[in-house]
Amino acid sequence: MNREVLYDWGLEVICWMQQFQSPFLTLIMQVISFFSTPAFYFAVVLLLYWCLDSRAGYKLGVAIIFSGALNTAIKEVLQVPRPFIRDSGVFMVEESGFSTPSGHSQGSATLYPLFAKFVLGARKCGHCKLGGKCGGRRKLPLCVLVRLCVAVGLPLLIGFSRIYLGVHYPSDVLFGLILGFLTSVGIILFWKPVAKLVSHWRASLQLLLVAVIVFLLNQFSGTHTSLNGALFGFLLGRIFWNKKELFWDAAGTPMQRLLRLPLGLAVTGVAFGFFELVKNLAEQVAFSVELQLLLKFIQFAAGGFVVMYLCPVLFIRLGLAMVQASTEAEKEAERKTCPPGDCQ
């Protein structure tokens, strides 16, 4: 199909959806879209990794940062203008950058299936313990329905909102959903064997693998190096957690675990602000596009490293968290995520 025909059809779909618009409906769609923004992802990952479940937080963090970096690279390669650039009549909200694929759709299809699997799926409800039977008949457990709604329904709803708001063609949303679901399914299927394989590598080889992945993403990302830097720093921080010790998120009282969040945000903000100051000073002394991109990469890499490694170390030093031997950590994490009655 000719791309122009596809985009014309997409504009027709957007116009048809917008004929039902109202201030209230538009507000609802903007609220739905918020649940697939970087700020919301950031909050979810930090809350999980620092306070609730470090293993799930780490997986979701790697997945959403990688998915976002991949989305940025593809957008820079395709360079498809947004629908409201092609037809100003569908303009409702301002969005920067290119259109294809939809970042909100891809991000939600990456995050929410993993959230449903590793967070919501960590425990069975009472109905599941009974084998899903009710009145002698087998029914789909409520917890399974909830996980399906989160894993599939929410990404579809977010994609719908992006079309309604006129910031993406239907084809953008479909492309983003496919990429996101492929990413989340890949994490679910291959995370454990890949992690087991890489864990036997030397730290230098692990670092080389991370550097190669980030380098390849950088080749297609144009001037957008932020997420690539965050991915590098986040994975570098994981490498720094050696095989003898792991950050134990479950240690501490509820208040101690809660205090990690404002403390970690403050430390991350200071580190990020420091590198922002360095970046601004360097640009005033010797400005160049290459220097600007490098400093932006370093700034976000530092942020990812602080979140992944330095903040947990600070929590441990201040008595807000503990470390445990990796073997014990794995057993404890397995116990936390294993459904009751299934653990060996």
Residue ranges and their predicted role:
Residues 56, 130, 335-337:
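Low-complexity, compositionally biased segments
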